Amino acid sequence: MEAALVRGDPVPLHEQIRSQRRAALAGLVLGLLGLCGAAVWAVLEPSPDWRHESVVVGATSGAMYAVAHDPDRLVPVADLPAARLVLAALRTDRSGAATATVVPDETLSTAPRTPAAAVPGAVAVTPESTIRASWAVCDSVDPEGGLVGTTVIGDAAPRPPVDAADAVLLAGPGDTTWLVTGGVRHRVDDGDGAVRAVFRLAGRLPRAATGALVSVLPEGPPLATPVVPDRGDPAPPGLPGRVGDVLAAGVGDGQQYFAVLDGGLQEVPRAVADLLVVASVARELRPVGADVLGAATFVDTLPVAGWPEGPIRVVEPDQEPVTCWTWDPDRPEGGVWFGRELPLDAGASPVTLAQADGTGQKVDAVAVGVGGAVRATGPGRAAGVGPLWLVSAVGVGYGVADGPTAEALGVVTGAVQPAPEAALRLLPSGRPFDLADAGRAVDATPG
């Protein structure tokens, strides 16, 4: 039977069977010796001496301490960033590179302790990391335009630009209505029927928008029918019609439009031309040739710079329910994007904040990956001079007081990416990190 089981042959070969028995016995003995050796090593191996470490954590309690010397003592800290600041305050070398060593709690039971360091805790902060310089602030709505939530995204996924003719209509705080097109927001005069007709806004219900989104969108001029001084008076010499009329001249395959003013002509966008025609005496465009334009005086009286240049198409909430302000270093003022879903990388999952209020004005979720250090920037601010922030993986922003504090935390300042301060200030904020706090002791750690 043994031969059949071992060799697959019912005919026994006694010497071969004995060899196999010896090999099995030797393997068993070696295995037992290995187990015994491991047990002996576990008993005899000395536990790490906390005095020789920089930061220690109790194996059972999870309590963390920075190790101070002269004399040897333990300084209770909230987490590793706080420990690094304490080590820097103690002028310990390589504080920014310090990591925690796990030691048995019983080895710490008789160790001298100080009061806790006056450094706040910071959950899920990784000072060595940074966040890719691509940010977005997004509002999401339901098919009827009702607000669903607001999300701040760091390391936003690239998305194709929206069509220049596409626009969204927003209902902002304070009963304001905004037309967002061409990367900017324009306030709409709800009582100006001509504006609503020219931009085909009649009957369209604006989608709800938070102050967080509206505040970061670049603002263009308000959309209201321009007031033309002396409308209806005779046009200046050499110009047809009356003040307030609109002239049209063919240029290549397109047309240019000119408002007749008391001082001469002003070129205007098509939308402004349409508004002026509605309000003019002639009620129609007056075609002119190059000879009239060549002899005319041109002025810049009407405040129409920055108006939409061409026809627009308002995108409905059920088509593209997400509206975002987007930012990257090449566009310091930011831009506008809208689509069917948030601009997230595949697999990314936003963290829902405790302050989330859904249809309210607060930020509801944040997606910044593992978080990290960033340098705040904004329009008009030179690169690399803004304040440092630490953004946690759960979406909380912490200020960093100065360069020595950043170095103590382990921030690699040369690798830190810029981030828009406008977006950072929308995040829930924690108490700033400051190396000066690490030298003070308190009975209760500040929150």
Predicted regions and their residues:
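Short, surface-exposed polybasic-aromatic patches that bind anionic ligands, especially phosphate groups
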Residues: 1-447
